[in-house]
Amino acid sequence: MSQRPLDVLNEALNSPVIVRLKGGREFRGELQGYDMHMNLVLDNAEELKENEASRKLGTIIVRGDTVVYVSP
């Protein structure tokens, strides 16, 4: 049986995830929460960039309509 997107997010709570946004930006952090619009709260987040050091951001909120995918 296939899972719904919010079921996957629920299973990923308190676990490390990688989030890719429209425009190609990627963030890695621990998923602390989400809502029905797929707005995400990441703790210990860092922005990942090719050929550059990652930038540590701490706790961030990611707007759901910018999310392309979440990889647990």
Swiss-Prot record:
InterPro entries in the cross-refs: Lsm7/SmG-like, LSM_dom_sf, Sm, Sm_dom_euk/arc, snRNP_Sm-like_arc
Residue span(s) of domain Sm: 4-72
Sorted UniProt keywords: Ribonucleoprotein
Superkingdom of origin: Archaea
Keyword Ribonucleoprotein applies: yes
Alphabetized SUPFAM superfamilies for the sequence: Sm-like ribonucleoproteins
Annotated GO CC locations: ribonucleoprotein complex
Pfam families registered for this protein in UniProt: LSM
MF term (GO), any: RNA binding
Similarity comment: family membership: Belongs to the snRNP Sm proteins family.
Name of the molecule in the record: Putative snRNP Sm-like protein
Higher taxonomy: Archaea, Methanobacteriati, Methanobacteriota, Stenosarchaea group, Methanomicrobia
